[in-house]
A protein has these predicted regions:
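General helical secondary-structure elements
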Residues: 18, 49, 57, 116, ...
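Noncatalytic linker/hinge segments flanking ATPase motor cores
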Residues: 26-29, 77-79, 138-143
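Small/flexible residues
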Residues: 18, 24, 53-55, 63, ...
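AMP-binding/adenylate-forming catalytic core of the ANL superfamily
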Residues: 2-11, 29-127
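Conserved C-terminal "lid"/linker of ANL adenylate-forming enzymes
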Residues: 82-88, 98-99, 120-164
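Surface-exposed acidic, glycine/proline-enriched linker/cap segments
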Residues: 9-29
Length: 164
C-alpha cells in the first residue's frame, strides 16, 4: 500500500521551522517518520508522553488525556488511583469530553454522585472544559493493555457501544 508507506515514512515539513529549532540545519527535503507518538525533549533526551490518537480536541483546544486523568485522580478519594480514562466523542457542534473512573476498593456506590460532582468541578476549573459524561464503574471495568496501561480507545468503543 504505497499511500500508507508514503504517509508513515516519507513525511516532509510543509515549511521551514523557525531558527533555533531542533530541525535547524536539516536539508529541505529531509524526511521523518510519523509514529503517532507525542513527546518532549528535555536536556537533549526524548520522552514519549502519549499518542496523537488519544489527544482530545474540544472547540479547537488541545487537551491531553493524561492531564485530565491526573486532575480526576486528585479530585476524589472515591476514585481508584490510575484507573481513569478520558476521551472525546463526537457531539453536534464540538467534541464532548467523557470520563470513566473506577470506584476505589471498598467504596460504596452511594458515594458516586458526590464524586462525580467533585470531578466535574475539578476538571472544569483546571482545564476549562465541562465533561459531558462522567461514569464511575466497578474495579477492573476499564480496559487495559497487556502491560496494564489504560486502553482509552477500547474504553471509548465500549462506552459508545453502551451509549447506542
Amino acid at each position: 500500500r504505497p499511500e500508507e508507506t508514503q504517509e508513515t515514512f516519507r513525511n516532509t515539513l510543509a515549511s521551514r521551522l523557525p531558527e533555533n529549532s531542533r530541525a535547524e540545519g536539516a536539508p529541505d527535503d529531509d524526511r521523518w517518520m510519523a509514529t503517532g507518538d507525542l513527546g518532549v525533549i528535555i536536556d537533549d533526551e526524548i520522552y514519549i508522553t502519549g499518542r496523537l490518537k488519544d489527544l482530545i480536541v474540544i472547540a479547537g483546544r488541545n487537551h491531553y488525556p493524561q492531564d485530565i486523568e491526573y486532575t480526576v485522580n486528585h479530585a476524589s478519594e472515591h476514585i481508584r488511583p490510575a484507573a481513569i480514562a478520558a476521551f472525546a466523542i463526537e457531539g453536534d457542534d464540538v467534541e464532548k469530553l467523557v470520563i470513566l473512573a473506577e470506584r476505589d476498593l471498598g467504596r460504596d456506590p452511594s458515594g458516586d454522585a458526590e464524586a462525580i460532582e467533585a470531578i466535574r468541578a475539578a476538571v472544569t476549573s483546571a482545564h476549562g472544559v465541562v465533561p459531558s459524561d462522567i461514569k464511575i464503574v466497578d474495579v477492573d471495568a476499564i480496559a487495559r493493555s497487556s502491560s496494564g496501561k489504560i486502553a482509552r480507545r477500547v474504553a471509548r468503543r465500549h462506552y459508545l457501544g453502551e451509549a447506542e
